[in-house]
């Protein structure tokens, strides 16, 4: 999602202007362009999946820089209070890792996907609602609203909801794991294995 920057319309389709607000978005666009150019010019098969917030087992949870959802789960499991910037009202499209892996497998094996770009998503939810679902699954947990620091406010993209109709139509992919089921599977995994990820 970081390739798009602030959404000019929702849901965001693959034709949405690419206006990243941070260097990660710029890097994602550059990587995508290189791969698709190699596909077109040199015949090296490539497809680009524009992923959104992904969570699940085996994802790092030490910090919030990559994978804020797993970091939230870690903080709640450690009985720490989460500070949600802006009250966590911003909507993110969320995918459980198994659904992302499924999309990668399908796209990688499909001739129709060659040279294409697809959005992943399908589970839009506010960050506060995600945290509430985790606290419900754990049976405990707290969060509080915090202000955006200036450096974070400058790169905050606001709401993001992906239009996944292209990948649904062309590759018959859509998420199968609900956010609630994914949270339960993630918590179950980290109850046994969290020490390896800290």
Where would I find each of the regions flagged by the language model?
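Catalytic helix-loop patch of NAD(P)-dependent Rossmann-fold dehydrogenases
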Residues: 2-48, 55, 60, 64
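A conserved pocket-lining segment of Rossmann-fold NAD(P)-dependent short-chain dehydrogenase/reductase
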Residues: 15-19, 46-61, 71-95, 119-121
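Short, structured secondary-structure boundary patches
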Residues: 18, 68-71, 166, 197-198
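Conserved active-site helix of classical SDR/Rossmann-fold NAD(P)-dependent CH-OH oxidoreductases
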Residues: 29-36, 69-73, 101-102, 128
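Conserved catalytic/ATP-binding subdomain
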Residues: 63-67, 125
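C-terminal substrate-binding subdomain of Rossmann-fold SDR/epimerase-dehydratase oxidoreductases
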Residues: 76-198
